[in-house]
Amino acid sequence: MKVIKTRNVQQALPEALYQLSFEGVRRDSRNGPVFMFPEPVTTVYLRPAERVLFWAERDANPFFHLMESLWMLGGRNDVEYVARFVDRMRSYSDDGLTFHGAYGFRWRQHFFEDQLPKIIAALKENRDDRRQVLSMWDADADLGRQGKDLPCNLQAIFQIACDGRLDMTVTNRSNDLIWGAYGANAVHFSYLHEYVARSVGVEQGIYRQVSANFHAYEEVLNKVAPLADLAANPMTGTETPDPYAAGIAEPYPLMSTDPEEWNQELMMFLSEPDAVGFRDPFFRRVAIPMMKAHKAFKQTSNPSRFDAALAELDNVAATDWKLAGVEWIERRRAAFEARKARAMDDGVAYE
């Protein structure tokens, strides 16, 4: 068992790529050749709330990661909501309408009851409880199924540690370290972790993800491989560039109001993001302006759409999401201007 113990996802990705460059074994897979670690890998996040990835080489979509996390906490499985942020998500659905293995739906509806309130109530009643397991894998529905979407993450185990904080351990059968573990999973599951911790009334502790198969697809790996050179080196004292460690970015609390009220506001946000009356600062100062920024960016008929999106991002109180959003928009502005310049050089009109 390999253990990658790290402060946050920003530092985890270069470290894993560095170790994979020495230990990776090339192997075929259902979706093309991969380089994989020859043994299971556990990632230990000491500060899981530092969940945002800033590497330009990875180009993580902060709007998608944030909104998909809320979609999961809302127990949804519909394609349409997440496809507005990443259209290719439709290709992972068997029927174009729902996702078979949607994590949030598994948490809150698939097993005919909402698992999260039961786990929260049990931990509030007994802080020494070791039986609180959130299930995602369903042997009846998943074992032997030949579909596009099966849960990769199988269970999340919640226990209050000796220091009084809530720790979470997630088990995973097959994990793409670039797109899954150190991208989407770091956001989705750290928000699940924080949601349960705040609902119980304790601080968020350590998040561990145990991946039985930890790999990177060769084609994608080649694009981000240079990040391995930025892994921390204790021998030389070199540290990984990290906006969190530099004090440029910091997490923003997911929940500041009563959990029941927060849940109601989550449902309202998912169905009516333009509604008024949100009380929790997370919705008013993070989720809503992030949603508005993405909506402005998608107005392709507006020649000022990049500036409009950045103006909305000025209202985001979460410095980590704000920074990631600004950088993501600016990368797209730069690409747009480059294409426009090439079109002018070729003597053609650009639209």
Swiss-Prot record:
Superkingdom field: Viruses
Intrachain disulfide bonds: none
GO biological process, one term: symbiont-mediated evasion of host restriction-modification system
Top EC category: transferase
MF terms in GO: thymidylate synthase activity
EC number(s) per entry: 2.1.2.-
InterPro entries: Thymidate_synth/dCMP_Mease, Thymidate_synth/dCMP_Mease_dom, Thymidate_synth/dCMP_Mease_sf
Keyword entries, A-Z: Host-virus interaction, Inhibition of host innate immune response by virus, Methyltransferase, Restriction-modification system evasion by virus, Transferase, Viral immunoevasion
Keyword presence, Ligase: no
One Pfam family in the UniProt entry: Thymidylat_synt
Catalysis performed (reactions): dUMP + (6R)-5,10-methylene-5,6,7,8-tetrahydrofolate + H2O = 5-hydroxymethyl-dUMP + (6S)-5,6,7,8-tetrahydrofolate
Functional description taken from the UniProt entry: Catalyzes formation of 5-hydroxymethyldeoxyuridylate (5HMdUMP) as a step in the pathway that replaces dTMP by thymidine hypermodifications in the viral genome. As a final result of the pathway of hypermodification, 5-aminoethyl-2'-deoxyuridine (5-NedU) substitutes for about 30% of thymidines in the viral DNA. These modifications probably prevent degradation of viral genome by the host restriction-modification antiviral defense system.
Family that this chain belongs to: Belongs to the thymidylate synthase family.
Listed name of the protein: Deoxyuridylate hydroxymethyltransferase
Organism: Pseudomonas phage M6
